Amino acid sequence: LVMSTARHHRSNRGLFDQRSLALEEPEPQPQVLTAPARKHLWFCIYLPNLPLEASGPGDEARAVVAEQQGVHRVLLASGRAEAAGIMPGQSANAALALLPTLHIEPRSEIVEQQALENLACWLEQFTSVVCFAGADVLLVEIAGSLRLYGGLLSLRQQIAAGLEQQGFNASLAIAPTPLAATWLARGGRRACIRDTANIAAALRTVPLASLDWPAATCESLAGMGIRSVGDCLRLPREGFARRFGPQRLIELDRALGRLPDPRSSWRAPERFCADYELTEEQSDCELLLAICRELLLSLERFLLTRQLGTQRVLFSFFHLKGSATQLP
């Protein structure tokens, strides 16, 4: 079912002997008076349950499965399914044996991407800078929006409430750099850091698993007893870069605000098009109407964000056989 609209109006001294990753204080330099640079503030939205939540909110017992070595295994399960004993890693057959009424959905990265894009569209009402930072992470730059939305606390509450209303269980964090905000959110630290000088302290206990670094790098560091960002920052810089590559050091410096971290802002297409993929043929009118209403709500968010209207809405119903049915 597709609906579209027309165009709108991270110390091992035996291995390292250089300076630690924490930079030494530079010699004081004469100050030149310049216009103050605009401070950034990044709001990160991490969606750890996106594969389950992408298909929309629901109270029923559900599980998302993914194929692993030829076996379909549970990736995520809803609260009601978990209460019945369904856990990630179980085979789909074992899950159904525990709960025959369990609704199983195959993971769809397309549906997840669409849900993330819909969320990005909704976030554009708060700021013009919306960035994708992974398959389950969105970043918005909010420094310029604070006054308009009643300050940081008010803006955070509005975004958090909107996410909950749309059925998303998000981990949120705010920091002056996009990477710091992302690592804090992925580490489950619901932090709000406004000063760059406080980033290192906030990141100290964040586990390396939250950094999205290669597994081999994290395993090698863990073998040395390095398990957090704070552990990494105590290592000598040159030795760290030589052993693990300069990119990891660059990422740490970007997270701490020592290096710039430019991001590309995402813009929604001018033409709205949304679809809903059914797992099987359906003739239930009430179900189809509910799906249409969900698509219309997505359109409403798209239009309200841009203060636009549309003159025409087209629904297309694709059948297993035969041509599509279109309802203008």
State each model region's role.
Residues 107, 126-127, 194-201:
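A structural signal for the main folded, soluble domain(s) of proteins
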